[in-house]
Curated annotation (Swiss-Prot):
Region (Disordered): 126-146, 304-358
Organism: Scheffersomyces stipitis (strain ATCC 58785 / CBS 6054 / NBRC 10063 / NRRL Y-11545) (Yeast)
Membrane topology classification: Single-pass type I membrane protein
Designated name of the protein: Maintenance of mitochondrial morphology protein 1
Quaternary structure note: Homodimer. Component of the ER-mitochondria encounter structure (ERMES) or MDM complex, composed of MMM1, MDM10, MDM12 and MDM34. A MMM1 homodimer associates with one molecule of MDM12 on each side in a pairwise head-to-tail manner, and the SMP-LTD domains of MMM1 and MDM12 generate a continuous hydrophobic tunnel for phospholipid trafficking.
Chain segments annotated as transmembrane: 81-101
Record domain SMP-LTD: where: 165-417
Coiled-coil boundaries: none
Lumenal side: 1-80
Recorded family membership: Belongs to the MMM1 family.
Gene Ontology terms, MF aspect: lipid binding
Domain notes: The SMP-LTD domain is a barrel-like domain that can bind various types of glycerophospholipids in its interior and mediate their transfer between two adjacent bilayers.
Acidic residues: compositionally biased ranges: 131-142
């Protein structure tokens, strides 16, 4: 086409102008090639970003498709889910086993059992009874008779130990509240609690580094314990005895405050004096109370009385036991510590002992809750308040005192008075001149 145009132009135009036309054609051709090359270059450069975007889009879709449809990735997610669920279940089981159903603290050492025997502490001693050479041959028959008596009582009272629902003790709570309220009124009017505690502190032998102790605060509270969820069960010791298990809850503030002085007597007497003020409050108690009636002549109970504890200043090894040369011969039963290594020395109760009779036995389960608040103030000018170490020591000491006396397998025994009607216990309401009824105090 270009050649035709050139020939035509050569025919029409004169020869003088032919050279310039050929140059013009070459220039046009060169410009056309340059434009074509520029268009190709611009087309290549403009298509690269779009291609990269398309490639990224395709790669992302391929990645998502691979995660959705590849079986190996799906099975890994399932494995992780199963392992996670199993680990959660394992942690829950470990927590329940070691924190919820954890065993109670081990029993206290033998030496701490006989530190304070002002209150009678008794403990079941079945090993002594089973291993004693002087055992009564009629024990089996007595046990059978006791079980038959218990079965007859349950049958005649229409009480099923296994299926009977727990009972509320609202009426008992009212009676206990009235009794406690009366005791509080008498204590406030006569100050007998203050005088009794003060006399006890004055008569107590104190170490040389401690000055006399003065009472600064006594709070007997204003709330009452709540008893609930009572159920009758057979005793776990196999004796067949019936016992009542009652839930107890007390939220009150019982406070005792004292003040004293720590004396530094070295190198000379009264070198330094450090005032100390302490206030201990019990703010919460809850637990399961076990109550049963026992016969104090039953040989399965071993009594730990006051004469089994050492005298002040006397070592523990010199404590007297029943039947020993230094013991009290007026007792007719064996005196044995709960952790005694010898289980063969046991003395039978005397059947003619006037102290034998019915007693109320009570104890608390080891899963009790006891909370204290201890406040301390040490020093005269520069005072230290609420020292954590002092609070911890006092709280641990109070808990140990309570465990040694009332936590199973130890329990307390309270002798019940005779319920037989007696003339000296007879009373009658009489009317005075004003028409008011008053209680006759004469026998």
């Amino acid at each position: 086409m270009a050649d035709l145009e050139t020939s035509d132009l050569s025919r029409v135009l004169p020869s003088s102008n032919l050279l310039s036309l050929e140059q013009l054609q070459e220039q046009l051709k060169r410009h056309r090639d340059e434009l074509f090359q520029q268009q190709q270059d611009s087309h290549v450069l403009g298509s690269k970003p779009d291609d990269s975007l398309n490639n990224n889009y395709l790669l992302s879709h391929q990645y998502h498709d691979s995660q959705v449809y590849i079986p190996s990735n799906t099975w890994s997610f399932t494995q992780g889910l199963i392992v996670g669920q199993l680990s959660v279940v394992f942690v829950i089981v470990i927590f329940i086993k070691f924190f919820v159903f954890a065993e109670s603290s081990p029993a206290l050492a033998k030496s701490s059992i006989t530190k304070d025997a002002s209150v009678v502490i008794v403990k079941r001693d079945k090993k002594d009874q089973s291993s004693s050479d002087d055992a009564d041959p009629d024990d089996d028959s007595e046990t059978t008779a006791s079980n038959a008596k218990v079965a007859a009582i349950l049958e005649k009272t229409y009480y099923d130990v296994d299926n009977h629902s727990p009972e509320s003790l609202d009426w008992f709570n009212v009676l206990v509240a009235q009794t406690i309220a009366q005791l509080r009124s008498e204590a406030l009017l006569s100050d007998n609690i203050y005088h009794s505690l003060n006399n006890f502190l004055l008569k107590s032998e104190l170490p040389e580094y401690l000055d006399k102790i003065n009472l600064t605060e006594i709070d007997i509270g204003d709330d009452f314990p709540i008893f609930s969820n009572c159920r009758i069960k057979h005793s776990k010791d196999g004796s067949g005895r019936l016992e009542a298990k009652i839930d107890v809850d007390l939220s009150d503030t019982l406070t005792l405050g004292i003040e004293t002085k720590l004396l530094l007597n070295h190198p000379r007497p009264l070198t330094a004096v450090l005032p100390v003020q302490l206030s201990v409050s019990m703010v919460r108690f809850s637990g399961c109370l076990t109550v049963s009636l026992i016969n104090t002549a039953d040989p399965e109970f071993a009594e730990l009385s006051a004469h089994n504890s050492p005298e002040p200043g006397e070592p523990m090894s010199r404590s007297h036991s029943a039947g020993s040369p230094g013991g009290d011969s007026s007792h007719d039963e064996v005196i044995s510590t709960p952790d005694s290594s010898s289980h063969t020395a046991q003395r039978k109760h005397s059947k003619d002992d006037p102290n034998d009779g019915t007693a109320l036995m009570f104890s608390f389960s080891p899963d009790y809750r006891l909370e204290f608040t201890v406040k301390s103030l040490i020093g005269a000018r520069a005072k230290l308040q609420d020292v954590p170490k002092i609070s911890s020591l006092i709280e641990n000491r109070l808990r140990a005192w309570f465990i040694e006396r009332c936590i199973e397998p130890r329990f307390q025994v309270v002798r019940l008075p005779s319920l037989w009607p007696r003339r000296k216990n007879t009373r009658e309401q009489v009317t005075n001149k004003n028409g008011d009824k008053v209680e006759d105090g004469s026998n």
